[in-house]
Amino acid sequence: MKVGVIGAGTMGQGIAKAFAQVDGYEVALCDIKQEWAEGGKDKIAKGYARLVAKEKMTQEKVDGILAKITPGLKEDLCKDCDLIVEAAFEDMNVKKTTFAELDKIAKPECIFASNTSSLSITEIGNGLTRPMIGMHFFNPADRMKLVEVIAGVNTPAETVEAIKKIAVEIGKTPVQVNEAAGFVVNRILIPMINEAAFIKMEGVSDIAGIDAAMKRGANHPMGPLELGDFIGLDICLAIMDVLYNETGDSKYRACPLIRKMVRGGNLGAKSGKGFYIYNADRTKTPVDAQ
């Protein structure tokens, strides 16, 4: 099966690895510029090189995986794909435009799936000549076991079953979800991160204290502010805004502190600063501990 992955950023790279690591799958890793797609594959290669250096993978295995990932432009590589998974920026207009372009070039039997973390599958697919489905991976996509399979209003049952089968084939656990804002995981998880930001903003505790409390008291592997940085505070904010706008419920109001941080470019680990400062030696320091 040939899988097109649209977006060669962090999620796209992980999704590409998730498929390429399994026999029977090849991947077209696409972005809007050739060099961006090639850069995505380069980052994948560097990640595997670290595993080889630690003797966790063989070079032969890595070479085989990388040979199955072809970087390029969607108009060149996606014409013969059996499945296309979009992992572009979390913006409705971007996603609708991307799929409208793909609809003109992909073969009729190709399945369209979006990795959106919160947006309406029905709206993304509106106007297309084929069904749309949500196939929501979690970061890092090659290692996290869950895939949320989201059915929109017009998603046929056979498409849902096909995606669930593919998810199992690549070693994932599919959970079927009927379309709703935030789906399952993010409707629970992102408000928790948002509430942790309110606790920080109100001075109830400091960053290290909030994260330590949830790790030690709730047995979470990462504290909520640390996790927000890992996900990306811009992504967290976008999801909170979707939850609030879709439901109208004030409990989903985004914390002003997160909005202010995003406006200032402090997005978390990917920008080098969020609730923590990320140092060159891969250590991190809470911003309120300086």
Task: Outline where the language-model segments fall.
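NAD(P)+-binding Rossmann beta1-loop-alpha1 motif at the extreme N-terminus of oxidoreductases
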Residues: M1-R50, K54
